[in-house]
Regions:
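Catalytic active-site module of serine/aspartate enzymes centered on a nucleophile-bearing elbow/loop
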Residues: 229-265
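Gly/Ala-rich beta-loop-alpha elbow adjacent to hydrolase catalytic centers
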Residues: 92, 96, 100
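Active-site loop/oxyanion-hole signature of alpha/beta-hydrolase fold enzymes
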Residues: 40-41, 49-91, 238, 252
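Conserved alpha/beta-hydrolase catalytic His-Asp/Glu region
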Residues: 125-129, 141-199
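Flexible "cap/lid" loop of the alpha/beta hydrolase fold
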Residues: 101, 105, 112-143
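Conserved HGGG/HGGXW glycine-rich cap/lid loop of the alpha/beta-hydrolase fold
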Residues: 15-61
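A short loop-to-beta-strand scaffold at the N-terminal edge of the catalytic core in hydrolase folds
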Residues: 6-16
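Conserved loop-alpha-helix segment in the C-terminal half of the alpha/beta-hydrolase fold
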Residues: 205-238
Length: 265
């Protein structure tokens, strides 16, 4: 990704330029900030920030439990280092989407609006720190060299645009293996977070039959729970990585949402 690269504490980030950010992008588990490059490149003129999550990309990994409150605080640390009046639009995928929801619920001064691409649903109640381990699929990918990882991605997801494959493949080798020596805490219910989010929310999801995490029924639950303006969009034929499975439709929904938010400021 071109533009400006830097660090805030243990976190690595990428900005399109030195100007104030319009949109901040938070990636999913085992991805990196660079995985947002195809989307950012397809939106000329956008002033974007993309952050490597702890233990991912070029970010460091503090020796402490992996919790969504930590991901929230990491994003807040970077955003508050160059605050923008009224906040920025935060776009997240999967783990990054849940992190964005945590951030919007507790730091509204930093978030103007939020886009959630197929976040986990979470679960109600208080969760304890638990041991976890590296998923077999990730270990298998990390054992391959880069060309083989790219080939595996192309074979498994033949509909993805070619420019998605290399950053996806590179990111897998960047996951810090010490991540799995730390404990992990499951997130609270997404509906609980939405009840505390007052800014506009766009939920983009695919089909559960293709691996999507959000069903139409759960999207309806989210709409009922949301404290602020809320819209859910299901992109038929897409799975968990909605933007990779159907980039044109994803970009159309994202661009319309950003234009609407900008028109209100």
């Amino acid at each position: 990704m071109g533009g400006v690269r830097g660090r805030t504490g243990h976190l690595a980030w990428y900005r399109t330029d030195e100007a104030a950010d319009d949109v901040a992008f938070l990636h999913g588990f085992s991805d990196s900030a660079q995985c947002w490059e195809p989307v950012i490149r397809a939106m000329p003129g956008i002033r974007a920030l993309a952050i490597d999550a702890r233990g991912h990309g070029e970010s460091g990994l503090p020796d402490e439990p992996i919790r969504y409150t930590a991901h929230r605080d990491d994003a807040a640390l970077v955003l508050s280092s160059r605050p923008r009046d009224g906040g920025v639009v935060v776009v997240g995928h999967s783990m990054g989407a849940m992190s964005a929801a945590y951030l919007a619920a507790s730091r509204p001064e930093l978030v103007r609006a939020v886009v959630l691409e197929d976040p986990p649903t979470g679960a109600p109640g208080n969760h304890q720190d638990e041991k976890w381990s590296e998923p077999d699929w990730l270990a298998g990918l990390r054992a391959l060299d880069l060309p083989a990882r790219i080939a595996r991605g192309r074979a498994d997801d033949s509909s993805w645009p070619d420019d998605e494959l290399e950053p996806w493949a590179v990111s897998k080798a960047q996951v810090n293996p010490h991540l799995f020596d730390l404990t992990f805490q499951q997130p609270i219910a997404l509906t609980e977070l939405l009840a505390s989010i007052t800014c506009p929310v766009l939920l983009i999801h695919g089909d559960t039959e293709r691996g999507g995490l959000i069903s139409p029924e759960y999207a309806d639950d989210c709409a009922r729970a949301a404290a602020g303006e809320f819209r859910a969009v299901q992109i038929a034929g897409a799975g968990h990585s909605v933007r990779r499975d159907n980039r044109p439709r994803y970009l159309a929904e994202l661009t319309t949402f950003l234009t609407t938010v900008e028109a209100r400021t």
